[in-house]
Each structure stands twice: as C-alpha cells, then as structure tokens.
Amino acid sequence: MFVGVVHLNDENFKKEVLGSKLPCLVDFWAEWCGPCRRVGPVVEEVAAEFEGKFKVAKLNVDDGQKTASTYGVMSIPTIMFFKNGQVMTQFVGAMGKSELKAKMEELLR
C-alpha cells in the first residue's frame, strides 16, 4: 500500500524524519510560493517511485516555523535530505524530476 507524502509540522518532525529508518526527503514549501507549487507534483511523483526506499515529506513553513528556523531555511522551496537523523545535503530552488531522482539515487549508494 502506497503511503504517499507525509505532511509534517513542528510536532511530528522529530518522529517522522529524525526517527525514520529510511532516508528522508523533506520539501520545505509554502502555499503562496509559485516555485513551490511547481515542485509539489514532482515531489509526489518521486514519493511513488521511491516507495520503500525513501520517506518523502513536506513541511509548510507557515505551519512549521520552528523547524524551518532550526534548519536555517531562508528561501523556499528548499529540499533537504536526511539520513539517520542528520542532514546529508540540501538544495534551494525549483528542481526538475530527473535532477531530483538523480540526487535520491546518489544518496542510496
């Protein structure tokens, strides 16, 4: 059963991301952000393609201001990759599907 994208907030971030057995992709976004709206469907697609290999999650920075601040998110969209509770890498700005998939595959090696 496809779990889909996990929706994060300040309360569930630690459990869902830092406590995850799988590597995590976290998309920091906001509804009012045009580039974020373009990245959203791409994030949904890679969630399906990497099911069981990655946990894919989204954090609306308006609902998760504390978490966004903790991780120094200053511009959105920002995509961060976590593994074993640690930030492995991050990217700021809109990404295409092929670029995002390549980054995910690289982190699985």
What do these predicted regions represent?
Residues 1-55, 62-109:
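Proteins that catalyze or organize thiol-disulfide redox chemistry
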